[in-house]
């Protein structure tokens, strides 16, 4: 298990690489703001800890080992992409120098903090618990890498300081500091601030390190969302102030706990669930409900544009199986995307025409004027459909009534449901008589991995952003996960007026959507970086005409 890789650690690795390789030195007199921190036990220790049996067996699969190999190589290529441009090929010698270090970040225990100075000035302090042999190897490899970049390696510039060495380029303010304290190797990148370094050394020598004990968690992450927004100068005000998540083993499963601290107060009073069971046709592979989360829901992309008058106080979402068996043979047909969401509305708000008009304004004339798109509505039938060629998905919104309540419903595949086959009563029973419950999500994770992998590939095809196909080890990895991952349940519970408690029990610590997003991200040429325009520019690709 020494080479095993824990999927939730990808977030921690990004945090490490982002600050470790992209920091710029700031003035020592500038105040630092904590942006995030982590504590990871390392796969070597996790393999000896209780629980997570499904995850541990998954990590021994050949497809998982291939993904780990790909991950380590991409992380080792990250510095060159940062310094010389995203998408450029990394220097093979520098990649070879860093690959064992990236593998050690997965295998050994580490703690780190990222601080912001003034955008884009960052400071990373990281400590990793290594054997003497490994500390020597890191010393040699990091010296070689700095020298290969043309950085000057020299003794500490601070008099009386206990670092082994420092390195900096000749023409910029970047600074790297390397030192040792007992079993821990300490590295800082960025601003020349010594306080944190000396505090950590003191804590290590007094056996009080790491400074934030995690009580047996395999991985702990804390992100200061509000501080990140202020640091980056982002105009929008985040709905979330702080998030902390902890992962640990629990029998066959991974237990995920934590909290979300919101900027606005959460309403204590709740209405009873309003669920139109005649629309939710069994079988389903996922079922979600939310209520009284308007401060969070309104921060999602497009929500305020589509719901200018009022954000729905509650909603129910579900999806049906995407795998479709061809009745004429064993081969499967193209997957269906039977994903739906519905929410109650007042009688005078049941018309979907306002949503249709807002969608036009949000999507823009250039998108809707494309010859492959047609947004049409029927006021009498109270529905609107976006017809896209080819027609794998046909997003729609419609209004309807169930009993005395009026609803609106949206989905990716327009369907007229005329029969009643409600989901199991036990599933609906999970959300009843639970006054603190604000969000509930159940899924068959393997089925959802299949669904989202194909949905993301469809998006890549329609918008010319590429697809993750069978020649990628990540494709084989997600196919393997389809057959290994079962039930997952996530809950958000109101703890106090500004805190939501996170609870999840799953096989991998992640939902199918999260797994598919991470696989798609790792597949990108620029991983672990993010190419901003690829997330903001959405134009339908021109399809090539078939050859005669």
Locate predicted features.
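A conserved glycine-rich beta-strand in the N-terminal activation segment of trypsin-fold
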Residues: 172-235, 392-474
């Amino acid at each position: 298990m020494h080479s095993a890789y824990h999927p939730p650690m990808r977030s921690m690795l990004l945090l490490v690489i982002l600050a470790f390789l992209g920091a710029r030195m700031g003035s020592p007199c500038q105040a630092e703001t904590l942006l995030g921190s982590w504590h990871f036990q390392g796969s070597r220790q996790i393999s000896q800890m209780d629980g997570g049996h499904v995850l541990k067996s998954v990590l021994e699969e050949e497809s998982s080992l291939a993904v780990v190999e790909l991950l380590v190589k991409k992380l080792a290529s990250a510095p060159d992409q940062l310094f010389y441009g995203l998408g450029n090929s990394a220097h093979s010698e520098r990649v070879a120098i860093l690959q064992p270090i990236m593998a050690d970040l997965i295998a050994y225990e580490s703690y780190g903090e990222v601080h912001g100075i003034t955008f884009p000035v960052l400071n990373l302090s990281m400590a990793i618990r290594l054997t003497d042999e490994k500390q020597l190897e890191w010393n040699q490899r990091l010296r070689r890498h700095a020298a290969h970049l043309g950085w000057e390696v020299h003794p500490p510039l601070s008099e009386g300081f206990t670092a082994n060495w420092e390195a900096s380029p000749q023409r910029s303010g970047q600074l790297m500091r390397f030192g040792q304290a007992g079993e821990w190797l300490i590295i800082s990148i960025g601003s020349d601030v010594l306080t944190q370094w000396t505090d950590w050394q003191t804590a290590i020598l007094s056996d009080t390190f790491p400074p934030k004990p995690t009580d047996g968690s395999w991985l702990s992450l804390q992100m200061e969302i509000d501080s990140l927004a202020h640091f980056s100068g982002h105009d929008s005000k985040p709905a979330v102030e702080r998030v902390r998540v902890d992962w640990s083993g629990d029998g066959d499963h991974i237990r995920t706990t934590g909290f979300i601290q919101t900027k606005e107060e959460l309403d204590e009073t709740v209405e009873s669930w309003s669920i139109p069971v005649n629309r939710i046709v069994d079988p389903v592979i996922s079922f979600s409900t939310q209520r009284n989360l308007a401060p969070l829901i309104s921060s999602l992309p497009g929500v305020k544009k589509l719901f200018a008058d009022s954000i729905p106080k509650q909603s129910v979402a579900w999806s049906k199986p995407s795998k479709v068996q061809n009745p004429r043979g064993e081969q499967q047909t193209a997957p269906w995307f039977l994903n739906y969401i519905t929410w109650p509305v007042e009688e005078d708000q049941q018309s979907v025409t306002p949503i249709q008009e807002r969608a036009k304004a949000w999507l823009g004339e250039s998108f809707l004027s494309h010859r492959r798109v047609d947004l049409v509505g029927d006021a009498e039938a109270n529905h609107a459909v976006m017809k896209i060629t080819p027609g794998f998905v046909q997003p729609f919104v419609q209004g309807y009534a169930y009993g005395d309540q009026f609803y609106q419903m949206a989905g990716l595949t327009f369907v007229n449901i005329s029969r009643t086959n409600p989901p199991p009563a036990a599933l609906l029973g999970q959300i009843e008589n639970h006054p603190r419950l604000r969000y509930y999500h159940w899924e068959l994770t393997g089925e959802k991995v299949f669904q989202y992998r194909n949905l993301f590939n469809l998006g890549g095809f329609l918008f010319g952003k590429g697809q993750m196909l069978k020649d990628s080890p990540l494709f084989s990895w997600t196919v393997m996960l389809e057959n290994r991952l079962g039930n997952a349940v996530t809950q958000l519970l109101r703890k106090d007026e500004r805190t939501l408690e996170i609870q999840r029990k799953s096989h991998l610590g992640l939902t199918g959507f999260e797994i598919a997003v991470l696989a798609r991200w790792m597949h990108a040429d620029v991983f672990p970086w993010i190419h901003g325009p690829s997330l903001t520019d959405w134009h339908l690709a021109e399809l090539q005409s078939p050859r005669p």
